[in-house]
């Protein structure tokens, strides 16, 4: 088996936290797709839950490189969440489709960090 095709198995605690993050992301996307999110404040509440799960993921991991990458994702998600409310309050700008696109990008980057297909 070539080095690039080798599967690495995550420890139970790390995999459990990744699954919690993935579940939250899928839940968020469903909420947007079924129009249960009625405005930017509902979106921010969903992002708060994602931030908690990202924090748990970083705390359960033990590889410094992945921890730093998850912290970077955590920072990006927090900043994006803050911008949702700021853009709405200042510019009356709120587009759920852009939020869903961002969530999908975050999920893809987390899958790359943890080498999950």
Swiss-Prot record:
UniProt superkingdom: Viruses
Protein name: Uncharacterized protein OR117
């Amino acid at each position: 088996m070539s080095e690039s095709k080798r599967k690495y198995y995550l420890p139970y605690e790390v995999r459990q936290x990744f699954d919690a993050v993935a579940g939250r992301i899928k839940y968020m996307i469903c909420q947007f797709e079924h129009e249960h999110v009625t405005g930017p404040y509902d979106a921010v509440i969903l992002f708060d839950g994602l931030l908690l799960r990202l924090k748990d993921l970083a705390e359960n991991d033990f590889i410094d490189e992945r921890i730093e990458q998850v912290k970077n994702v955590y920072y990006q998600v927090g900043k994006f969440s803050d911008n949702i409310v700021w853009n709405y309050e200042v510019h009356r700008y709120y587009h759920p489709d852009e939020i869903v696109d961002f969530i999908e990008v975050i999920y893809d980057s987390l899958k790359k960090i943890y080498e999950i297909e």
